[in-house]
Regions:
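Glycine/proline-rich, flexible active-site/cofactor-binding loop segments
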Residues: 1-6
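A short acidic-Thr-Gly-centered motif at the start of a beta-strand
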Residues: 9-28
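Eukaryotic intrinsically disordered and solvent-exposed regulatory patches
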Residues: 12-17, 143, 149-152, 182-189, ...
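Conserved polymerase palm-domain catalytic core
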Residues: 22-174, 192-197, 205
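Active-site and adjacent loop segments of nucleotide-processing enzymes
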Residues: 55, 113-127, 131, 135, ...
Length: 319
């Protein structure tokens, strides 16, 4: 049964969807844990952290498995008995550090205790807190010998505060059973057949096949966004193009990974290229950067089965 709903990043989520999603989907739902940084009770966060740390050191039968966690130069590892390392930590050491962290990074606003979102540890603390409830929910069902319901969560994912659930149209009915009452969960599904999650737009076709393409919240705004430099600005031209090569390649990689159809990929590439041309970038320089992108990452666009020359023509056809 699938009880780890947390992808490492949006790329991990996309790869999981593309490799393991069901051949036919009958529902697609998304939810948002709104303002959850400001609503996580510190007492519950400490309790859940203590339990998770304890489980890391124990076997399933309740016997101790490890004595220390050792921080090495290039890796961390558990040891069962003794270590002469000066950077070894017992279970109590780790929890005491976590407790100190929780007690000293909070902020007060309007009488509420908040976890500051800008700290490095905030997403990790929130992730482990929510994971503990998700795992407890699935384990609780299995202990009751229920198999059908937990199986319906096999295609459920949560990236920080965004939840995606495939083939489980009744996920919303279980929300109150999974998460603590302090959290506010909103259904953010666009339609019965489409929705957006993280930086992906997902859509079901008439045969239940799941398609993906790149999604950017800024596209929904009714005013233009300036997110790349203008060549006419007071900066040296050579560094500007150097930055562009990096930006262009990285963006095209993201588009090729996210866009299941060639047309969606071209639309995104054309939008980016047009934007940069309008900001003073030279056409010949952009084409050169595109060739570099294809040369290094051709495997990502080979699946479209379109020759590079045709892709270049399609992306630059308005120039």
């Amino acid at each position: 049964m699938h009880q780890m709903w947390i992808p490492k990043n949006s790329k991990d989520l996309l790869e999981f969807i593309q490799s393991r999603s069901p051949s036919s989907c009958n529902s697609i739902k998304t939810f948002d844990l709104s303002t959850f940084y400001t609503t996580i009770p510190h007492s519950k966060l400490k309790d859940k952290s203590r339990v998770l740390v304890h489980l890391c050191f124990m076997k399933k039968n309740g016997l101790r498995r490890y004595k220390y966690l050792v921080l090495g130069r290039d890796r961390s590892y558990f040891v069962k008995h003794y270590s002469d390392s000066t950077k070894k930590f017992a279970e109590t050491d780790i929890f005491n550090m976590l407790e100190f962290l929780i007690d000293n990074i909070f902020a007060m606003f309007d009488g509420r205790v908040l976890i500051p979102m800008g700290t490095n540890c905030a997403p990790l603390l929130a992730d482990q807190f929510l994971y503990s409830y998700e795992a407890d929910f699935i384990q609780g069902l299995l202990k009751k010998n229920e198999k059908k319901l937990p199986r319906s969560f096999n295609f459920t994912f949560r990236y920080i505060d965004d939840i995606l659930s495939l083939n489980n149209s009744r996920f919303g009915d279980s929300v109150d059973r999974i998460y603590p009452i302090e959290l506010e969960i909103k259904d953010t599904t666009d339609t019965d057949r489409s929705t957006s999650c993280v930086d992906l737009h997902l859509e079901l076709d008439s045969e239940g096949r799941l398609g993906t393409k790149r999604y950017d919240k800024r596209d929904d705004l009714n005013f233009p966004i300036v997110n790349f430099q203008f060549i006419c600005s007071i900066i040296p031209a050579a560094p500007a193009y150097g930055v562009y090569i990096y930006i262009y390649i990285s963006q095209m990689i993201r588009y090729s990974r996210a866009c299941g159809s060639y047309q969606d990929f071209i639309d995104r590439g054309l939008q980016l290229t047009t934007k940069l041309l309008n900001q003073g970038f030279y056409l010949v320089k952009l084409k050169s950067s595109l060739r570099i992108c294809y040369g290094r990452h051709h495997d990502l666009v080979d699946r479209y089965e379109i020759y590079m020359s045709q892709q270049t023509t399609d992306i630059f056809h308005l120039s």
